[in-house]
Amino acid sequence: MHSRFIAVTLASLSLASQAVAWGCIGQDCNQAADQIAFSAPEPASYEGKVKSLAWEPTPGQGWQWSSCGTGDEVVNVESIVVSPDPPVPGQNLTVRAKGTVKDEVSDGTFADVIVKLGLIRLLARRFDVCEQARESNADLQCPLSAGEYELEHTVALPREIPPGKFNVHITGENQDGSNLLCLDLSIQFGFRR
């Protein structure tokens, strides 16, 4: 299931980067029906939780993530590893994730994803987690039992991703209304030569 959230995040990043590449930002993107409003936690809640996503512990390679939750969420992500790092527009990106699901995840579970380029909000969208898993023919399907999971997912990044720092914030709720997860990703795309 963690791979599904990362895949949803990367799909959102792909949509957002294409919107930027086509000069389409905000309400002009025909995303109005999908846009929702919610707030990110205060930066103080991130202290001590930032981890590098590089295959080797090399700072500044393009990715960072942090858990912005309280630890009581249904899904607790323990590690995320990406390759290549830094990510390269127009190439495949492989994401490996490891974590724990505390309670069953079933129909009615959703994830809210916000993608920003700097301070500009490119995308805010709610995803039905189980529906996304079915549509993408994911290895794990709902209902998902409590347990530990390690998953790998590869996504094609569009060539049109502009240079810049993308910030992705993911939250959600389980089918019973409990907090699903809280995850922040910072993704730096460099200048093409």
Swiss-Prot record:
Pfam families: E1_DerP2_DerF2
Segment forming the signal sequence: 1-21
Superkingdom of origin organism: Eukaryota
Propeptide: 22-54
GO biological process entries: intracellular sterol transport; sterol transport
Role noted for this protein: Catalyzes the intermembrane transfer of phosphatidylglycerol and phosphatidylinositol.
Assembly notes: Monomer.
Name of the protein in its database record: Phosphatidylglycerol/phosphatidylinositol transfer protein
Organism of derivation: Mycosarcoma maydis
